[in-house]
């Protein structure tokens, strides 16, 4: 293959899979930032020292980004963000998956897949530069590459100007939001047998829910909720119990 044609996809683009669950607002925000800024030409790519992840020593000879690798980086940064778990920092996708969805995988005439373009970008550039951390995964695969667990670092987010304090603020708000949601969705009535609900008329069931709510919330919380808010919670809990009863009696 002529040297000028050795790259199969000159302009790789991340194409997220269809019918995937919706990503968090923060991931949407981060992906938007990363798409608006040329992450491959960030000053960090020229000012950070490349470190050998195995020894911790500075790499004296280090290959910087050529245009083909820069194009690959622009695509794969978005893919990593898309699959990023905000709680563990883990990218929940293999290198092969990232390569496939960014259009970086190639096939030989015999049908063998190569993900070298993606794997070398990750192991030879992004990891030494400190944008990600990689851990080897134990596998029985006979492939000619080693799948890894990829974790995003604070330097990764600095590529598109998102600071660690911004991430921490989001995580704090997310934690509080989940806590509030669990509190809202909590079922206050525990029946030893779900069929007991069939023996209660609506008024009795609602009174039982009301008593449970009064026991659950403090006086100040009940004041803040107010009569209308309390009525709404009773409606929600009564509806949940009815659905639960119907589900178990199909």
Swiss-Prot record:
Entry keyword set: DNA replication, Plasmid, Plasmid copy control
InterPro entries noted in UniProt: Plasmid_replication_init_RepA
Residue intervals passing through the bilayer: none
Cited Pfam families: IncFII_repA (PF02387)
UniProt entry tagged with the keyword Nucleotide-binding: no
GO biological process: DNA replication; plasmid maintenance
NCBIfam families per the UniProt record, alphabetical: RepA_IncFII_LM (NF040977)
Similarity comment text for this entry: Belongs to the IncFII RepA family.
Function noted in UniProt: This protein is essential for plasmid replication; it is involved in copy control functions.
Official protein name in the record: Probable replication-associated protein repA2
């Amino acid at each position: 293959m002529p040297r000028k044609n050795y790259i199969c996809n000159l302009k790789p683009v991340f194409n997220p899979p269809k019918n995937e669950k919706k990503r968090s607002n923060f991931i949407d925000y981060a992906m938007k930032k990363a798409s608006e800024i040329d992450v491959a030409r960030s000053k960090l790519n020229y000012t950070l020292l490349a470190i050998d992840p195995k020894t911790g020593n500075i790499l004296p000879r280090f290959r910087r980004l050529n245009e083909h690798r820069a194009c690959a980086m622009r695509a794969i940064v978005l893919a990593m963000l898309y699959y990023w778990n905000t709680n563990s920092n883990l990218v929940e996708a293999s290198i092969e998956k990232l390569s496939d969805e960014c259009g970086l995988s190639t096939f030989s005439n015999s049908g063998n897949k190569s993900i070298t373009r993606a794997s070398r970008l990750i192991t030879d550039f992004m990891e030494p530069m400190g944008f990600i951390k990689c851990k080897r995964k134990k596998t029985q695969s006979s492939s000619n590459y080693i799948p890894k667990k990829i974790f995003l670092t604070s330097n990764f987010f600095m590529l598109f100007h998102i600071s660690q304090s911004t991430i921490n603020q989001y995580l704090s708000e997310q934690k509080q939001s989940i806590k509030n949601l669990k509190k809202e969705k909590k079922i206050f009535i525990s029946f030893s047998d779900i069929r007991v609900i069939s023996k209660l008329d609506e008024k009795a069931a609602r009174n039982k829910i009301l008593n449970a709510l009064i026991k659950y919330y403090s006086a100040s919380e009940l004041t803040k909720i107010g009569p209308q808010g309390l009525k709404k919670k009773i409606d929600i809990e009564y509806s949940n119990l009815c659905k639960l009863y119907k589900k178990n009696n199909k």
